[in-house]
């Protein structure tokens, strides 16, 4: 009786491990995983406060570097965004805020992006088109929302719907399948709006390069950056988003393996002992 109870306990622990691993794998393949292969994050890092240029002026210089490098044959797409780049921070550290639809208010994740960012991450459009930084003909701002926000609102069609945020009117121009902020978590209700909504704050620069061209891109970017910045106390750093994603996933699965492997051995020994 005692041996059977031990076997049953080990069996249920092992079953729990398999269920958790299965859920994590299912969450990874759920809608909204961004394509980060062959992408590079370019980070502008002030070494010390500039005596001559403000942060916004430094950013304008960086914009000119990006505009020039964007024309390189090594580059597929080079964009600028805020809070859109995934896997760089825990989900709770991404920006979320309240939006209004009619009389209803709801809390959603907010992203800011330019017209290139959907090409950088190869976002999957379900309906409509990606946004630009230009106002629409009626004077409203374009917005793209995730299908999860559509579901939350109970909309069967989202294109043309109005959303209000901090006194600005947005018109939905596109729907994406999702935007996952962590690889092993589901996509959340999210709204993406143009960079112009918050023009004077920090931005994240992301590029998609052709296969095998990462080193050539970095060399070119460093060259143009140094030419533009001169002796300004600022440096350029590169981040590998794909590696960060894999590290995030590895940490989760190592924890699960730490539980699962001893449980498997206990399971085997429990049956060998019968």
Please identify what each model-predicted range represents:
Residues 101-106, 133-137, 192-197, 206-212, ...:
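Short, contiguous acidic/charged loop-to-helix segments that flank catalytic cores in large enzymes
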Residues 104-189:
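Hydrophobic secondary-structure segments that place a key small or acidic residue at a functional site
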Residues 5, 9, 13, 18, ...:
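Hydrophobic alpha-helices of bacterial signal-transduction systems
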Residues 21-104:
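Membrane-proximal extracellular/periplasmic loop immediately following the first transmembrane helix
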Residues 1-24, 251-274:
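Hydrophobic alpha-helical transmembrane segments of multi-pass inner-membrane transport and secretion
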Residues 65-76, 147-148, 167-253:
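"Rare, low-scoring activations can occur
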Residues 87-93, 138, 243-250:
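Short, solvent-exposed polar/charged micro-motifs at secondary-structure junctions
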Residues 17, 21, 58-63, 110-114, ...:
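A structural signal for well-ordered alpha-helical scaffolds and beta->alpha junctions
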């Amino acid at each position: 009786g005692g041996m059977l109870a031990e076997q049953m306990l080990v069996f249920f622990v092992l079953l729990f491990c398999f269920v958790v691993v299965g859920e994590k794998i299912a969450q990874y393949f759920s809608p909204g995983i961004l394509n980060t292969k062959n992408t590079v994050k370019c980070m502008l890092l002030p070494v010390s406060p500039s005596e001559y240029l403000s942060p916004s002026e430094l950013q304008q210089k960086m914009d000119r570097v990006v505009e020039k490098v964007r024309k390189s044959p090594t580059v597929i797409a080079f964009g600028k965004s805020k809070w859109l780049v995934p896997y760089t921070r825990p989900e709770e550290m991404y920006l979320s805020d309240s939006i209004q639809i009619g009389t209803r208010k709801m809390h959603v994740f907010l992203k800011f992006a330019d017209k290139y960012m959907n090409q950088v991450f190869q976002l999957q459009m379900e309906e409509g088109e990606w946004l630009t930084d230009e106002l629409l003909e009626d004077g409203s701002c374009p917005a793209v929302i995730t299908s999860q926000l559509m579901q939350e609102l109970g909309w069967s069609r989202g294109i043309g719907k109005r959303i209000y945020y901090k006194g600005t009117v947005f018109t939905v121009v596109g729907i994406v399948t999702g935007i996952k902020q962590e690889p092993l978590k589901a996509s959340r209700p999210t709204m993406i709006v143009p960079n112009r909504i918050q023009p004077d704050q920090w931005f994240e620069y992301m590029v998609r390069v052709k296969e095998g061209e990462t080193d050539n891109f970095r060399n070119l970017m460093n060259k143009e950056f140094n030419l533009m910045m001169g002796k300004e106390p600022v440096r350029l750093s590169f981040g590998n988003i794909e590696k960060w994603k894999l590290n995030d996933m590895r940490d989760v699965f190592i924890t699960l393996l730490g539980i699962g492997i001893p449980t498997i051995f206990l399971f085997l020994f429990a049956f060998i002992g019968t």
